[in-house]
Amino acid sequence: MAGLRARGGPGPGLLALSALGFCLMLQVSAKRPPKTPPCPPSCSCTRDTAFCVDSKAVPRNLPSEVISLTLVNAAFSEIQDGAFSHLPLLQFLLLNSNKFTLIGDNAFTGLSHLQYLFIENNDIWALSKFTFRGLKSLTHLSLANNNLQTLPRDIFRPLDILNDLDLRGNSLNCDCKVKWLVEWLAHTNTTVAPIYCASPPRFQEHKVQDLPLREFDCITTDFVLYQTLSFPAVSAEPFLYSSDLYLALAQPGVSACTILKWDYVERQLRDYDRIPAPSAVHCKPMVVDSQLYVVVAQLFGGSYIYHWDPNTTRFTRLQDIDPQRVRKPNDLEAFRIDGDWYFAVADSSKAGATSLYRWHQNGFYSHQALHPWHRDTDLEFVDGEGKPRLIVSSSSQAPVIYQWSRTQKQFVAQGEVTQVPDAQAVKHFRAGRDSYLCLSRYIGDSKILRWEGTRFSEVQALPSRGSLALQPFLVGGRRYLALGSDFSFTQIYQWDEGRQKFVRFQELAVQAPRAFCYMPAGDAQLLLAPSFKGQTLVYRHVVVDLSA
């Protein structure tokens, strides 16, 4: 029987010994202390919390189950991308009294369970636009008592379920950069404690929530370099022909009148054609009865009129301009009076006279000689109040105003602009019901004059030593004045309607400009600046929203 029991299984003694050994193992195991979770020296940790003081970086060696982290008096200045991504279960994060100055994009990426984020009493002066990206569970956010002066537009957009926001204790500058916040506060369902402006003075101590949006003037403009034409030029004239936009440039350096065509696809000016012109000072396009003509005024070698032949797609010389009448042209103006086309040439030679030509059937013919012996420099045609006028500026006397006589069909001298005896160029503009003249001077200040009914009166002087070119122009309701100089960069002024004066707006790096030309090209508003010494520059007028 004993042998049978041995083969069938353990006896009672062996079973008892096994039971005793198991009990001893349990006793030994019960006496071992629990395993200590990992924790950096600067932190105090439990299984799911960590409290860190004087850390030199975001602690890395933390329990993986941590759901609550507090950082106090941290010694690093920036929280970078993914700084807490190693703590994916984090639900509570307190960053208090640290030396942070900047929190970057995606700083809290990977914290999809974070519900409470308190960033308080730090030195933070800037947050990135995507600082809070990825915090889809965040319900409470505090940015109280930092040095924030502004907030990036739509910084709170990723926080879909945010319930409470605290921005108190910051130095918010309530300028255009904060306009979006005023709009957001008016429409959000998030509870936001009252916050106040620290600046500018007119808004100081005003509650941000109560600021009227109409007080924010945040739309401005800018002229940005759009295209560089790698050649000098002394005049620029845009024109439309057969529904296409072109530009005629006088380029004595390459002995040509260059015709450029606007490419509406590439949105650039492209080479199109050239007219031989060894000493061109002005290339004036005119479209008469659907035919294109270009008047080429030259200092030497005679001046000519070219006609565009659409059949041969080339320019052919149509007629010569009498060299005894036009000796040394300096400017050319084209205009229409009572249905007839004219162009006038300012002659700057000592023995020359500004001449008027009229289109008749198949050519331009001499119509009138104006202002002889005065070395004329510029012309400006003014058609206001039904009285066409031509203003002629001269280097030897005050600008002369001629008025068109419909009886004589000629210009008749009307008077002089005595305030500026040595104007190099003359331009005009209207603002409201008032008419103004702009006169540039090479030595002395350029002048802005207003017509008072019987005479001109000076309203403004603009510093302009070395100026040979100026041009007022209107873009989308905004009036500007481009004023060039041979000794400094070009100044752009903007018209202040309240003060009825031009105020300095922008400086453009144009060397020795000889003209300025405004050219709308589709939705692009362009300002061309032909340069005598350098490249011809094309600037684009852009509208800038400072609140964006």
From Swiss-Prot:
The name this protein goes by in its record: Leucine-rich repeat LGI family member 3
Domain LRRCT stretches: 170-220
Positions annotated with a glycan in the UniProt record: N189, N311
Pfam families assigned to the protein according to its UniProt record, in alphabetical order: EPTP, LRR_8
Residues spanning the signal sequence: 1-30
UniProtKB keywords: Cytoplasmic vesicle, Exocytosis, Glycoprotein, Leucine-rich repeat, Repeat, Secreted, Signal, Synapse, Synaptosome
Location within or outside the cell: Secreted; Cytoplasmic vesicle, Secretory vesicle, Synaptic vesicle; Synapse, Synaptosome
Top-level taxon of the source organism: Eukaryota
GO biological process, one term: exocytosis
EAR repeats: from-to residues: 222-264, 268-310, 314-361, 363-406, 410-453, 455-497, 501-543
Chief subcellular location: secreted
Start and end residues of each LRRNT domain: 31-64
Start and stop residues of the LRR repeats: 89-110, 113-134, 137-158
Known partners and oligomeric status: Interacts with STX1A.
Known role: May participate in the regulation of neuronal exocytosis.
GO CC term (a single one): synaptic vesicle
